[in-house]
Amino acid sequence: MLQVVISPAKQMRAAQDAFEVLGIPPFARETARLHRALLDIERNEGSDSLQALWNVSDKLLGPCLNTLHEFGPILKNGDLDNPALACHLSPAVMSYHGIQYQSMAPEVMDSAQLAWLQSHLWILSGLYGCVRPFHAVEPYRLEMGAKLAVDDAPDLYAFWSDKLARAIAPAGSNTTIVNLASVEYAKAVLPHLAGDATVVTCLFGEGIRNGKPIQRSTASKKARGSMVRWMAENKLEDVSGLTAFDVGYRHFPELSNNNTLVFLNEQTL
């Protein structure tokens, strides 16, 4: 079984009604608990503590607080029919609006490509844990690396523990994970995988320095989105097919191994 993991985006859009949601994320109660924890911080410590947790400017603090207050946890599929909640909901893959998602361009995919996304792609999230592309989400602000202590968990990595790994690659499923997530998000999953799971991490370089690919954040985000789109277009089911990826990059076998595939910007080759 092939599964792909990617990071979310900080930038999110309000409800996109051109596409219907398909159910709710798998960890609805955990999401509600985290939302309560954020509200508790505001009530007990003030908005300055939230500003530090979110690492946002004075200008962004107000909009982030509004998003927090407007957020309404959904606990069951029946909540999707609640008009007060539905106006804030949209499919996750349409809600995130960063460079990676713009490069992926799911809004212009055909139905077969979108179906591939829904069955193969997981979007990792500090608040939701992990979501399928068409699971219903609301705008929020909470990065996986945020130092949010909840109950006995000192941070979100401890809070989520092995839950995400078990959802994405259940023990005995012999899942191969294509890791397109940032280090911040990947470490919420990869250390907890069962022994039968395998991981292939894709790196995108703009050149080579000291025998290693030169990675640049913006270019890598764009390349990750292009790769997800390419996989959906080709309905990829076998990780060996990844080396054929050729959207602006070419596989560079000299720097690759069984667990890491390196792709270099074709303009540098």
Tell what function each PLM region has.
Residues L2-V108:
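Active-site helix-to-loop segments that bind/position phosphate- or nucleotide-bearing substrates
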Residues M104-L269:
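Internal, well-folded beta-alpha domain core
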Residues M1-L2, L269:
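Short, low-complexity, intrinsically disordered N-terminal peptides in bacterial proteins
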